Every structure is written in C-alpha cells, then in structure tokens.
Amino acid sequence: MSQTEHHISIEQEMRKSYLEYSLSVIIGRAIPDVRDGLKPVHRRILFAQQELGNSYTRPPKKCARIVGDVIGKYHPHGDSAVYDALVRMAQDFSMRDPLEEGQGNFGSIDGDAPAAMRYTEVRMSRLASEFLSDIDKETVDFRPNYDNSLEEPIVLPTKVPNLLLNGSSGIAVGMATNIPPHNLGELCNALLKIIDDPDVPIDNLLNIIHGPDFPTGGFIYVGQGLYDAYTKGRGTVKVRGKVEIEERKKGAQSIVIREIPFGLNKSSLVEKIAILVNERKIDGIADLRDESDRKGIRVVIELKKGVIPEIIINALYKFTPLETSFGINMLAVVDNRPQLLTIKSALTYFLDHRREVIVRRTRFELNKAEARLHILIGLIHALDHIDEVVNLIRSSSTPAEAKIRLIERFSLSEIQAQSILDMRLQRLTGLEREKLEEEMHELQTKIAWYESILGDTKILWGVIRDEVTGIKEMYTTPRRTEVIRETLTNIEIEDLIPDDDVVITLSRRGYIKRTNLAIYQQQRRGGKGVAGLHTSEDDFVQEFITTTNHQFLLLFTNKGRMHQLKVHQVPEGSRTAKGTHIANIVPLEKEEWVTTILTVREFSDNKFFLFATRKGMVKRSSASYYARSRRTGLLAVGLREDDELIMVKEVTNNDFIVLATAEGFAIRFSCEDVRNMGRGAAGVKGIALRPGDSVVACLILQEKQDTPAIMTVSNLGYGKRTSIDLYRVQTRGGKGIINFKVTQKTGLVIGAKPVSDDNALVLLTSTNKIIRMSVDEVRSAGRATMGVRLVKLDDGAYVVGFDTVDGTVDDSCDDATINT
C-alpha cells in the first residue's frame, strides 16, 4: 500500500498551532464577550442553571449539581475552575451586582476559602434572569457542545450591560483585560443618552458615568488616568480605602477603616499594618484589632495619646495597600477578535446586541402570531359552515380523507384542516366562537405592532429605551465608591508635621529620643533640667543636638557606615523617658554602634564633614556625597584594618582640628590641610601615632568659638583643663605635642573636649556612678601635667566616659543642659 508523505516546516506548524492556541485562550477562556460581558465558563453556568430551572423563584440547588451539569454538558474542564467561577458570581465583595444567591460558606473578604461544593447551595439572582430572558425565542445562535450531543448559546440575550456593570479581568496569551465595575444607574443613563444621540461625544458621557463603582466602596480619584481609560481604553486610577476618626476616653483617638480598595484581602491589610508597627515604620499606634462582622468592615487602630491621626492615616495610605492603583485595560472580544474599547464603544456594542436580540425576538413573535392567526382563520371559517364540515367529516372513511376533502372544499391549508380535525366539540358553542374572534383581533393588533417594530427604526429604539429604563428602575442601587475629581498627589508625611524645634539625645548605651525643645526651655525656668540628660543610673547623654523636625538626621557608626532618616522619624519621648534603642530604628551589625549624629537641612557642595578614626586618619568630604542612603546604610568612610570611626563633625576651611590620643599626645592643624575626598576614601594621616597609641578625641575649634580651654580626662579619674593657646598649630601628619602626662597613676586618656568656665562636667564610671562638677572646680594646668583627681574610684573601677553641659552644677543640678 502506497503512503503519501507531506513535508511541512516546523516553524510554520508551530506558528499555526500557537496562533490557534492563542485564539482559543482569548476567545474561549480569558477574555469576555463585549455583548454579554461573560466568559464562556460564566455563560455556561447560567445556561445550565436555566436548563435545571435553578431560578430565583425556586429553591436553591447544591453547587455540586450545578458544577456537574456544567462540566458534563458544556465545559470539559476541572470542577474546581467551574466552582471557583460560581463562587465568585455569588460574592458581594467581588461582584458589583452578584449573579448568584448563595447559601452557605462562599468565602470572605479575608481570603477564607469557600466550603466544598457538596455543602453549598446556589440559585440565580433576579438580575441573572435578565441575562437569559427570551433565550427560547431564537434571539441568539446556538452551537454544538464539545461532544455534539447538546447545544449551547454562543452569547446570552442579556438586557444588562454586564461588561461594564461587573467588569472583568483575565490574562490571555500576549494580552490581558481588566475592566472595573460600574454603577448600573449611571450605565443605563449613558445608554439612554446614546439612544437619543448616537453621535454624543465621550466627554458628555463622562458627565453621566462618574467612574468605576467598586463593591467594596472606597474613594476613587478621577484624573487623566481615568480619562485615558474611557477615551483610549487604557489608564490607571488611584483607589483608597475609607477611614474615620473616632474619639476615645481621655483625649485619645482611633482610626477606623470602614471600606477597603477593590480586590484587597482585609486580613493581609491588617497583617501588613502590624508588620509596619513592629518594624517602627509607623509609630504612634497603641493597638490594632479587626472588629468586622456581618454589618461591614471595621478595623480599629487605636492611637497613642498626642498622636496626630492624619499623620498615621497618611502613613497607612503610603505604606500599605489601603491605597492602590487600578490599571484599566478595556479589552473584550468583538466579532471573535480581541478589541480595545472606549467607554462609548462598549456601550454601543451592547446596544447593537440588544437591537439584534429584539429584532430576532420580534420576528419570532411575529411568525408565531401569524401562524396562530392562520389557524384561527381556518377555525372560524369552519364554524361558519359547521353543519357542512361535520357532515363532510362523518362521511369520510379516514382522517386523511377528511383532511383532503376539507382542503378542497373550503380552500384550507393542511395546518388549518388539521386544526379543524383536532378541534374539540366544545368549540362549537357560540361562546367559544366569540373567544376565537377576540383572540384573532388581539393577534392582528400584535402583528401590526411587530411589523411596526421591524419596519420603523424609531419604534425599535423606543422598545430598547423602554427596556433599559425598566432595568434601571428595577435594579439600580446607590453608588458605593465616592468619586473625588482631582488627581491624587502623594502627600509626604512632613506636610502634616510642623517643623518645630526639637532636641535629639543619644545616650552612651545607644538610646535615642526626640523631645520638643519647649520642654527644656520651660525646665530651665525652675525645674531640675539635668533629669532630662540621662536615661538611667548607668547611662548618660553622649550626643545632644538642637534641630527641627524636617531636617535630615545622619547617624555614623564606628564601622564607617552612615544611616539617614528624618528627625521626625525618631520616636518622641518625654524629658525623663529612656528612649528607643538605636538598633530598633536602623540596622546595626554585631559590635557596631553609633558614634556621632549630625543634622543637616540640605546636602550642599559647600558644606563639609570631617571624619576622624581611631588610627589617626582624617578625611574631609562634601555633604553632597551623603545625600542618598540605603536601608542597610551607606559607606561613609573607607576604614583600614583594625580601625574605626570615632567622630564626624561639620567643618569650614577656617576651623582648626585637634586630635588627642590615649597616650597623652595631641596635634592641632588647620582644616585646610585636609583636602576634599570622595565618600569611600580612607582619608589622610592626621597624626603619626606611636606604637600602641590611638586617637580618643577629635575637637573642632571654630575661629570665633568662645572655648578658651581643652578638658582632658583619664580613665583613672584624673583631669585638667589647658588653655587652647598652649596648642600651637602644626602640620597635619606630625607626632604632635604632649597634651596630658600619662602615668600609671592617671591611666590612659579617654577623651578631650573644648570647655569654658561656665560649663559643667558629667562623668560616668564603670560602677554606673555619675559624678557632676563645675568646670571652674578643675584648676587650669599646662600641657605636660597630669591634672587633678576628679573622682575617687572604687577598687577596680574606672571612668568610661564624660561630657560637658552648659551652666554650673550645684547640689540640685538646676538649669543644666547638654553642651551643643
């Protein structure tokens, strides 16, 4: 037997097969039809329910029964896909106007899964019945099902503009659709407008259709994005949830979320808020709980006392899905091809569909009426000659003979003759004759009406208008999504925070807080100001900066990294509060701590930072290099092995730099000796250290600063103040001069600071004791001296740190504030 071989190109075959697959997905699965707004699975579900009699007037049926009929007769796919579609059609948070009425667990807005289909029951909603109205009147075409055993409708003869009413979303091959739901009343008004004026501009329709109307409510911001979506088919709109502010006892307030954006999982939103609170990205929330019930959504966010609720609301919109973007892509199947639609074209295609349905329905009704009228004419004619008809029938030997004789004698059609033969004897009464004549006149009136519809376009559109008006009056519900006619701009949190003067304090143990400066100013009028300078008995303030809320706060660590945040992001604390550990605000590595904090309002090329390291390196860099930062921090200075950053200061060319070492040496040089270098540079040598020595302090002496002396303190409690004039200016990189006579008795130098006579000194020991004294109690001495004993230490104890404060210190420590 001969065989015929056909050689085909694999490239052509793959192109052909992929195109067929793509069209199958587009037309048969993922993209809705512009006429009824349904995908095949939804259309088959509704038709199967129609065939089962599962209407809104009858008791619901098990979902398993519906799903079984759909996959067995029309939709040869998995049962889960059909059940998921059926469930979604019953969810009032997924569909603007649900097409199913469900009984049982059909899932929730929290993302809970529905119960198994064997437990749930469903029936079509009253609105869904309008999708199938007149389907038995040849209004739409049918096609064979997948095994040619039954027929299914290609499209439903819906009276409802479902494509825009409930919207649709789906992903096909190389394309996707995402159409938002709308308000039925607005859609019907737009349809009526197009019926009255087919050439109406789209802009006029936009005055009728105000925007999407989501089942979950919320706010929608109408701007260019929505205009593009309605006029071009693609655009993006901003959607926000709706919140309220409630007053609580003792002046506290709560934020209550009542509506959320469409498609958002409520439990995921609550979880996201909780995560942000734990990560301290949103501060000021005391409690968070979900009080939602069958009456609606209610997520309560209790605020701490004194927190401005508008700030938290803005943070929720900024950091959580409470504000989302809805991308509109109005793609639908038109004449078996995907097409991008405008709002007007979508409505026009629906009206064209309604016109075709009404024309086909009218023709069906006309044919039916004419057929019935034809029979009635024959029956009435027979009644006019009833005696002759009866005799003719009685004299005939068979029904077939009687039919032929009736046709020949009275010029009847076969249908008329058969109707006469089928007529019951009771029809021979006079009353029945009157009924037949009355029915004939009614049919003649209907036929005239049907013919007028088919013959007059105005009458046809009048019928469509009446049906649209009826749907509007029957099913319209109030708008749920509030439209705000303005483009949403991202409001920064700073816009809601006043740029007040504040104080940032960082303790030696790493606790940081932000306090309003007015509290310290009030305290100086009679309170114990020093109470605001330490966080606990074993800690004291290391950094104290007066700044404003809107400035940038730069935190430099010993490992040479910089973290950047806004001042207002530092948690606020009272004057006596301990504060928040810095590790809870910025990520720190093991054995890493913040050594210096600076604040700047802008990162100018003319502003410079000076960096000093433990190994005597110094670097001057432009502040503009540090304008950007990352979540994990930014490399601020390149450190060599076993080196660490000890201080960063803002400097000018006129400043002088003093480096002090642990072995008691110091060097003073001009800032101009340190050239401007890049962010990752290690710097240049500031002082040549002797073996085993290290830098413990870096002082910036401003040209006009009134600090006549340098206070130097050792770890065994000795200290002295020395006039700045005794430190001559040297060349950078030298070994320096003696600053402090280090002996076994004094121990090593732990630090040095510029002071004046009206300053006070605060020392912290290893046994957690804090000692305070006035600077003028420490006698002035030369450079090559060891000073005096500042504190008597217990055996094994040592001084771990010290700082200076403005104001003398008496027994009550009144009026003392940290030296800035």
From Swiss-Prot:
Give me the reactions it catalyses: ATP-dependent breakage, passage and rejoining of double-stranded DNA
Top-rank taxon: Bacteria
Which InterPro entries does this entry report, sorted A to Z?
A: GyrA, GyrA/parC_rep, Gyrase/topoIV_suA_C, Topo_IIA-like_dom_sf, Topo_IIA_A/C_ab, Topo_IIA_A_a_sf, Topo_IIA_dom_A, Type_II_DNA_Topoisomerases
**Entry's SUPFAM superfamilies?**
GyrA/ParC C-terminal domain-like, Type II DNA topoisomerase
Q: Which UniProt keywords apply?
A: ATP-binding, Cytoplasm, DNA-binding, Isomerase, Nucleotide-binding, Topoisomerase
Gene3D superfamilies attached to this UniProt entry: 3.30.1360.40, DNA gyrase/topoisomerase IV, subunit A, C-terminal, Topoisomerase II, domain 5, Topoisomerase, domain 3
Residues covered by the Topo IIA-type catalytic domain: 31-496
Residue numbers of motif GyrA-box?
A: 523-529
Catalytic-site annotation from UniProt: 119
Q: Which GO terms describe its cellular component?
A: chromosome; cytoplasm; DNA topoisomerase type II (double strand cut, ATP-hydrolyzing) complex
For this UniProt entry, what is the primary localization, expressed as one broad class? cytoplasm
Please verify whether the record's keywords include ATP-binding: yes
Q: Tell me its EC number(s), please.
A: 5.6.2.2
Where it sits in the cell: the answer is: Cytoplasm
Provide the GO biological process annotations.
Answer: DNA topological change; DNA-templated DNA replication
Please give the Gene Ontology molecular function terms for this protein: ATP binding; DNA binding; DNA negative supercoiling activity
Q: Does the keyword Nucleotide-binding apply?
A: yes
Family listed = Belongs to the type II topoisomerase GyrA/ParC subunit family.
The miscellaneous annotation reads:
Few gyrases are as efficient as E.coli at forming negative supercoils. Not all organisms have 2 type II topoisomerases; in organisms with a single type II topoisomerase this enzyme also has to decatenate newly replicated chromosomes.
Q: Describe its partners and assembly state.
A: Heterotetramer, composed of two GyrA and two GyrB chains. In the heterotetramer, GyrA contains the active site tyrosine that forms a transient covalent intermediate with DNA, while GyrB binds cofactors and catalyzes ATP hydrolysis.
**Known role:** A type II topoisomerase that negatively supercoils closed circular double-stranded (ds) DNA in an ATP-dependent manner to modulate DNA topology and maintain chromosomes in an underwound state. Negative supercoiling favors strand separation, and DNA replication, transcription, recombination and repair, all of which involve strand separation. Also able to catalyze the interconversion of other topological isomers of dsDNA rings, including catenanes and knotted rings. Type II topoisomerases break and join 2 DNA strands simultaneously in an ATP-dependent manner.
What's the name of the protein? DNA gyrase subunit A
Q: Which organism is it from?
A: Lawsonia intracellularis (strain PHE/MN1-00)
Upper lineage: Bacteria, Pseudomonadati, Thermodesulfobacteriota, Desulfovibrionia, Desulfovibrionales
